[in-house]
Design a protein with these regions (language model features):
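Soluble acyl-CoA-dependent acyltransferase catalytic core bearing the H(X)4D motif
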Residues: 1-12, 16-19, 55, 63, ...
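Short, structural beta-strand-to-alpha-helix junction motif
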Residues: 40-41, 80, 177
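N-terminal "assembly arms/tails" that initiate or stabilize quaternary assembly
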Residues: 2-35, 40-46
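A generic secondary-structure signal for well-formed alpha-helical elements
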Residues: 21-25, 52-59, 120
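A short, structured beta-strand-centered segment in the mid-to-C-terminal lobe
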Residues: 73-91, 97-100
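Amphipathic, well-ordered alpha-helical segments in soluble domains
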Residues: 13-20, 51, 87, 91, ...
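Conserved alpha-helical segments that form or flank metal/cofactor-binding pockets of metalloenzymes
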Residues: 41-68
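Structured surface interface patches that mediate subunit assembly and partner/cofactor docking
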Residues: 2-7, 28-37, 60-69, 97-224
Length: 224
């Protein structure tokens, strides 16, 4: 990701999410996010606002990271949508400086933009460049678990282009545009949807790796 302007990517996605949330009916704040069924739209916004704010303030996770994340969301349970939006947009310089060095925050945000679209019934822009920019990072994040499982690389193919988890022969290669591939690799597709994708190789051991890395949904998000 060294050649990516992570701050610019993050802020562009942040601005789109803020615009979508600001324009939604008030009642939609309590809509469940299908990709994150334990969270409402309000919770999703609280997550995106609170995590960078905590890191900028030096509040680092010391235990189970998911418990730390949920604690940050819970702490903003009574904060209004308007106040959450204002907090998220309050210091672009500090925010840009943080995400320029923490690529995982950018990937998390790009994934959650798709989740927000699903919650609000909006059609995601599959041609937006951010998913393709984050795809190599999503693949690289799976290299360790795949290697530990003794499997070959995951390969994504789209036209005459391809991306791999690492420099090894692929054991599972599937066809998808970058947006769809990013959604799949960040566990936004069911096991059956992944089985149905045009592919070569044995998908089954890779499903186990993906599910252990981030549990796959048991019901389709209906994004196709």
């Amino acid at each position: 990701m060294a050649d990516l302007d992570l701050a610019a990517i993050y802020l562009a996605v942040r601005d789109r999410m803020c615009a979508a949330i600001a324009a939604m009916p008030v009642a939609d704040a309590e809509t469940i996010v299908p990709a994150c069924p334990d969270w409402t739209v309000h919770d999703l916004l609280a997550h995106q606002t609170s995590m960078p704010a905590a890191l900028i303030a030096g509040d680092l996770p010391t235990g189970v990271i998911n418990e730390w994340i949920q604690g940050l969301v819970d702490a903003r349970r009574d904060t209004s949508i308007d106040d959450l939006l204002a907090e998220w947009r309050s210091d672009d310089a500090a925010l840009g400086g943080l995400v320029a060095n923490v690529g995982i925050l950018v990937g998390d945000l790009v994934a959650h933009e798709g989740d927000l679209c699903g919650a609000l019934g909006a059609v995601a822009d599959r041609t937006a460049p951010e998913s393709e920019a984050m795809l190599p990072g999503a693949l690289a994040g799976l290299q360790g678990p795949i290697t530990e499982a003794g499997l070959g690389a995951i390969e994504v193919r789209h036209g005459d282009r391809s991306w791999r988890t690492h420099d090894a022969e692929p054991g599972w290669s599937f066809e998808a545009d970058p947006w769809e591939a990013f959604r799949a690799l960040t566990s936004r597709r069911t096991a059956d949807e992944l089985r149905a994708a045009a592919h070569t190789g044995d998908v089954e051991p890779y499903l186990a790796v993906l599910d252990a890395h981030l549990p796959l949904p048991t019901a389709s998000l209906g994004e196709r």
